[in-house]
Amino acid sequence: MTENKSFKESHPLDDFISDKELSNTTIQKEKLTIEQQKQVDTISKQINPLDNEGLLAFGSDLQKQMSQFSHQMLDEVQSKDVGPIGDTLSDLMSKLKSVNPNELNTDKPSMLKRIFSRAKSSINEIFSRMQSVSAQVDRITIQLQKHQTHLTRDIELLDTLYDKNKQYFDDLSLHIIAAQQKKLQLENEKLPQLQQQAQQSTNQMDIQQVSDMQQFIDRLDKRIYDLQLSRQIALQTAPQIRMIQNVNQALAEKIQSSILTSIPLWKNQMAIALTLMRQRNAVAAQRAVTDTTNDLLTANAEMLKQNAIETATENERGIVDLDTLKRTQRNIIETIEETLIIQQHGREERQLAEKELQQLEQDLKSHLVNIKGPNKQS
């Protein structure tokens, strides 16, 4: 399977996740590029002093996009149930177990009648069952390939969601910096001017302007805090997306291992075991014929006996112990069982992510309601 390049490469948001303190959302201006600083200046100009309605709308579009993004993430987690993948893998394991290597073991002593009359029937029965199981395994392989394709598409979709979340994060960061920049400008320039004007004036409206400016700065500070909360949600969403991606990636790799390694190996080993069984029956039949000829040709009994022993010895050199085949099938079954464990872990992780995303969505809605509430009262 071709690995998704963007999934493997480091994303710029990873630096914020691993190195930065989550509560510290103030970004140093010297780290901004020239283009970013221009964007900050443009955004900062959108904040007009004493325009409370404009302040309430500042960054609200981004927060609405975050709400829509949370819905999309929740829908993604709820709609992607990997239960059918687990059922398919369980079915595959059942089919592989249905043909036991012990059934191909003919080391136990048998009578001449069993060798000649039942050996051929036993081989045909096992061969017929192997063909049936092999056909079923092929159908399961097609299903696994479809599951693998779906998982790969999901990984690519999650990459898109991750990049979109990163863009929200960056846009919110620029809005926060712009608001902080405007706040400093008002505190250090505009407010002192109004205070000085009020001190030199006897007009009560000048004093009211100072109070209005102070209240506006306070609302601006609260607006910055709300944007920081939204930015925090974007920050926490990133590792959750990666967590789901990692589970899907591991499951897709296990499916690929089953398709390209385990299943072909199982078919090859079964074919080899069946060939060895036929060889053993042929050797046993040859030994029986040699013994019968030895009884009839008494004159050459010793010579025939020696030839039979030598022939049997040479033929027996081709016998292979089936312990290796048993270990191989055990490893195949263990691989599939491990895949089922990963699938179960993935289901648990997605359930946990779903609960967390629902809580995050509820928190965001609560903040948006709290923002709109004071405006309506005023």
Curated annotation (Swiss-Prot):
InterPro entries xrefs: Toxic_anion-R_TelA
Domain of life: Bacteria
Recorded family membership: Belongs to the TelA family.
The species this protein was found in: Staphylococcus aureus (strain Mu50 / ATCC 700699)
Listed name of the protein: TelA-like protein SAV1406
Signal sequence coordinates: none
UniProt xrefs under Pfam families: TelA
